[in-house]
């Protein structure tokens, strides 16, 4: 259910794009992300840092898209967000000694420290690659193809990455 909740702004962006175009879709994505943050704050009293970062990036890049009437800003948004996540994972680990992946998943999994480090780096590399891939699609495909990639391509890539990660992690999990 959380996965669908996380996709909420992207799904609404996709639907609005198909019905009304990129600029309305951008406004819908901003509103949906604001609503998402408000809902999380209301329900849980605490909003994850990643969601705050997502809100900030969509407001800045979506706002620039609407004010300047230039769709390139909203198209760059995923790359900026993915690269911020990648840098955040690496910086938190090596500058501040905190493994954010372990912090997010540590209650569900018991893994040796070197495995947590590999997992953290794998996610950082994955986010960096998603950012590069987004730029490639923006530069080489139509706006409509980019929107399809944004929903289906990145979501599919994340699902495949999580499955591969789960298969890799299986050898480290202790039977209880």
From Swiss-Prot:
The chain crosses the membrane at residues 3-23, 49-69, 72-92, 118-138, 149-169. It is found in: Cell inner membrane. One of its GO terms (cellular component) is plasma membrane. It comes from the Bacteria. Keywords: Cell inner membrane, Cell membrane, Membrane, Transmembrane, Transmembrane helix. It is a multi-pass membrane protein. The keyword Repeat does not apply. Pfam families: IspA. Its main location: membrane. Disulfide bonds: none annotated. InterPro entries: YciB. Plays a role in cell envelope biogenesis, maintenance of cell envelope integrity and membrane homeostasis. Belongs to the YciB family. This is Inner membrane-spanning protein YciB. It comes from Burkholderia mallei (strain ATCC 23344).
């Amino acid at each position: 259910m959380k996965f669908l909740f996380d996709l909420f702004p992207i799904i609404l962006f996709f639907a609005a794009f198909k019905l009304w175009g990129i600029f309305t879709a951008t406004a819908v994505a901003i509103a949906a992300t604001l609503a998402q943050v408000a809902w999380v704050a209301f329900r849980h009293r605490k909003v994850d840092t990643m969601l705050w970062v997502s809100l900030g990036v969509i407001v800045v890049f979506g706002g620039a898209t609407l004010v300047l009437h230039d769709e390139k800003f909203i198209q760059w948004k995923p790359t900026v967000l993915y690269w911020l996540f990648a840098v955040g994972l690496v910086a938190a680990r090596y500058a501040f000694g905190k493994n954010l992946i372990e912090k997010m998943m540590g209650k569900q999994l018991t893994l040796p420290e070197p495995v947590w480090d590999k997992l953290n780096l794998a996610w950082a590399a994955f986010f960096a690659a998603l950012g590069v891939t987004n730029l490639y699609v923006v530069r080489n495909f139509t706006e409509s193809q980019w929107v399809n990639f944004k929903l289906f391509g990145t979501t599919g890539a994340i699902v495949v990455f999580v499955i591969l990660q789960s298969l890799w992690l299986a050898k480290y999990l202790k039977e209880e």
